[in-house]
């Protein structure tokens, strides 16, 4: 079986010489300390106005590793981590790598019963927790075997002045974090304060196959699973990044927009920034405005489409507001104009500093991408990946960007497009399921061999492949064009419908902001398309424009692809991992269909 890579010269899209040639056969602790040893004065972290150098980061990680060692955490044991993006993430990665422990990263938005399951399934005896999660951990700890809870606060990393201001704000807001009277709970600073820095443990030796990190899947298409990776996988992932034409240069600043419990945030952002001796500008929030608010602080951002959509919307509204205020000669208008002009200057200066915006986690349509790039006068690089392949696997070349595609395979990545039913490789131009092979595929779904074997397959040449579940085709230049999820295929009578095709047609209508198409159960067919639509202008009457939308679909789509239902929503729902929540829309859609059927029945009676 030959992969599609053999038909395209992908090397031309990669650097001939990588930014950095890493030794992959070492621990993450070893890689970061060896890469930064001659540049310890460089900034490793920016957090809420305070910076930490590589020297200070490594010293603090050594102390944390020793503190873990002192409570008898050994090579191969598991530590659960529930935290926002803040320096404790870097300290945890390095310290737990140093002692050979396995890190289990848990989504902060998980339900209590799921947190219990994640902790117990990975046999964690120690937890590192963001202080706002303390009430949750306190309520469930007796249902686990946890012996120690290390509580970290953003205030641990603030400058003295900002820390005082933050404390005053908490007091005003009535926020008070009190540790329970329980010896299992300890504050981070107390946990490490008595460590003897003159008697630190020796780092463990590297083991290529040792499970080192556990992350959760997004759960957007099924029950969330725990995905096991090795340190080699993380090292291999950053090596592949070094072959892209993106500016992962020593001393540059990377904006950390994605939380650490998502592998795109943990591996491609936080760990990668340390591997390249860059500064990680960490934003502790997960809101859509984080990139916009931090413009001017970074050279490259790895974020999700929703972050760039927010930037685009704010910049358009800012310019529109300034135009209106310039027509008003009142004193209040002049004051507001001055404020708006100051904000515009900040935004434009920040965009000018940024060398590139990288987008992943969800799609950006071709028209939308072009419009945003023209507005920012900056390249937006589309990327694609999944948890099983440790984040980014396919990236658009910065200087050969093709809107509408997700790019080309990164160095060391092989892809093939197959018939989902026969697994036969399809020729260039035909739509099928994307399979991915590389040296950093996941080890397994924890304690779930059946699900592991469903997604991880071995061909006749003993090469491992991961089924992505995504539909795509490869164009004549080797670029990969997404066509939705294989698992989202709508089966209408004898037809298989890809929702992406319908979404592109509807999204091209000027007054449409966003569109998601899902399959819903119908009285006549097993499944039919329902289009959920967000309008740009909230004052528009959806009833008045719905016929125009349907006419557009009738003009451009085969009859069987024209949606049976068109519904308006205020905004598209997203999963905790910033992916469109198809399951929620399917449930909403089926509820709408049932209600329509019930009303028809009542009328007949």
Name every feature range the model reports, one short phrase each.
Residues 53-55, 203, 212-236:
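Conserved AMP-binding A3 loop
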Residues 58-64, 193-195, 208, 227-247, ...:
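Conserved structural elements of the adenylate-forming
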Residues 110, 438, 443-444, 453, ...:
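AMP-binding/adenylate-forming catalytic core of the ANL superfamily
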Residues 235-253, 261-302, 306-338, 342:
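Conserved AMP-binding/adenylation subdomain of ANL enzymes
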Residues 299-300, 314-402, 414:
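Gly/Ser/Thr-rich phosphate-binding loop
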Residues 408-412, 424-457, 497:
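Conserved ATP/PPi-binding loop(s) of AMP-dependent carboxylate-activating enzymes
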